[in-house]
Amino acid sequence: MADVKVAGRSFSGNGRIDELMQSWGFYPDSYLYIMEGVPVPSDTVISDDEKVDAVRVASGG
């Protein structure tokens, strides 16, 4: 399974990043996803041995 790090915690799963994040109780649009130092879209499909860092973003005025 792929490893996704969110707010200092690790989660495992295979599938679309946004769907996995939602299943773990996070709002997928609130994060930027980084794989191997490169930003990737939230609809990226991840699988075995891949690593993703989810970085919380802030917006507003």
Write out the residue ranges for each language-model feature:
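Ubiquitin-like/PB1-type beta-grasp interaction modules and other compact soluble beta-rich domains
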Residues: M1-G60
